[in-house]
Amino acid sequence: MFLLTGYEYFLGFLLIAAAVPVLALVTNLIVAPKGRAGERRLTYESGMEPIGGAWIQFNIRYYMFALVFVIFDVETVFLYPWAVAFNRLGLLAFIEALIFIAILVIALAYAWRKGALEWS
C-alpha cells in the first residue's frame, strides 16, 4: 500500500519543476554557437568600441555600506508584518520585537565603533 496518497500531483509538479531548468541548460549546450570566447569577453558599450578597461576595482567601503543597508533592509522586512499585526499579537510578541531591535542596535553600535560607517 502506498502511504503518500494525494501527493501524486505534487510529485509530478516537482519533477517537472526540476526537469525544466535541466532541459533549458542542455538545450543551451546543444544549440549555442561555440568558439567565440574572444568576442564574448569584450565590453559592450551600445555598439561603440569600448574606451578603457571594464575591470576596475571598487573601494571595499562600498561593500560595507551595502552590507549595513541589507541588514537594516531585512530588519524592515521582518518588522513590517509584526507592525501590521501588533494589536493581535500581545505582550510576548512586543518583547520579542524589542529584543530583535536591541540586537540590531548592538550590531549597529559595533559596526560604528569599528569604523565600518566612516569613509576614510
From Swiss-Prot:
It is found in: Cellular thylakoid membrane. It is a multi-pass membrane protein. It comes from the Bacteria. Keywords: Membrane, NAD, NADP, Plastoquinone, Quinone, Thylakoid, Translocase, Transmembrane, Transmembrane helix, Transport. The chain crosses the membrane at residues 10-30, 64-84, 89-109. It holds the Pfam family Oxidored_q4. One of its GO terms (cellular component) is plasma membrane-derived thylakoid membrane. The keyword Membrane applies. One of its GO terms (molecular function) is quinone binding. GO terms for biological process: photosynthesis, light reaction. It catalyses: a plastoquinone + NADH + (n+1) H(+)(in) = a plastoquinol + NAD(+) + n H(+)(out); a plastoquinone + NADPH + (n+1) H(+)(in) = a plastoquinol + NADP(+) + n H(+)(out). Its EC number is 7.1.1.-. HAMAP family: NDH1_NuoA. NDH-1 shuttles electrons from an unknown electron donor, via FMN and iron-sulfur (Fe-S) centers, to quinones in the respiratory and/or the photosynthetic chain. The immediate electron acceptor for the enzyme in this species is believed to be plastoquinone. Couples the redox reaction to proton translocation, and thus conserves the redox energy in a proton gradient. Cyanobacterial NDH-1 also plays a role in inorganic carbon-concentration. Belongs to the complex I subunit 3 family. NDH-1 can be composed of about 15 different subunits; different subcomplexes with different compositions have been identified which probably have different functions. This is NAD(P)H-quinone oxidoreductase subunit 3.
